[in-house]
């Protein structure tokens, strides 16, 4: 079974006047999202939450530019079960992650559980890593994209047989 997830990139200004701020249901902000990127596998916070946190840390130099960040996110996270949607409610998924942009020195990520209609977390990348990181083979975004790391793993497997 797959834990489906969607990642949105939204400027933090769209949360400032809402009573729940970054903890609100992100489907209400779909008109303000720079991207709605669906990933079919491993959407739980211990994987995708940490992946996004690691990715933000590796790309801190572009965190102030929402559109550039959204484009690079798709490039770096792409694999064969990655799709883009106009609206987040067009695809069934459990977790919606929002990367809140606008201040490169104060980045936040929220995780909303669509199945239970509740916010799981609103944390900085460092706090996500501290809380959720496990002994898993996360992508090293300083050196690879998700796809290039997978290709390198396949090449290694082929060469060992």
Give residue ranges: language-model regions.
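Short acidic-glycine loop/turn motifs at beta-strand connectors
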Residues: 10-15, 31, 100-103
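Low-complexity intrinsically disordered segments
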Residues: 53-161
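Short beta-strand scaffold segments in enzyme catalytic cores
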Residues: 4-9
């Amino acid at each position: 079974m797959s834990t489906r997830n969607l990642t949105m990139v939204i400027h933090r200004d769209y949360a400032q006047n809402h009573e729940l701020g970054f903890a609100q249901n992100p489907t209400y902000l779909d008109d303000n999202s720079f991207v709605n990127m669906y990933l079919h596998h491993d959407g739980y916070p211990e994987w995708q939450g940490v992946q996004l946190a690691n990715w933000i840390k590796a790309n801190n130099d572009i965190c102030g530019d929402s559109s550039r960040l959204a484009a690079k996110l798709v490039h770096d996270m792409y694999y064969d079960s990655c799709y883009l949607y106009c609206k987040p409610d067009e695809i069934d998924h459990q977790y919606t992650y929002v990367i809140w942009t606008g201040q490169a020195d104060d980045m936040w990520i929220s995780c909303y559980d669509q199945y239970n209609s509740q916010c799981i977390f609103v944390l900085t990348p460092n706090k996500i890593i501290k809380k959720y990181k496990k002994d898993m083979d996360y992508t090293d975004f300083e050196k690879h994209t998700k796809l290039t790391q997978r290709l390198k793993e396949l090449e290694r497997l082929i060469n060992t047989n």
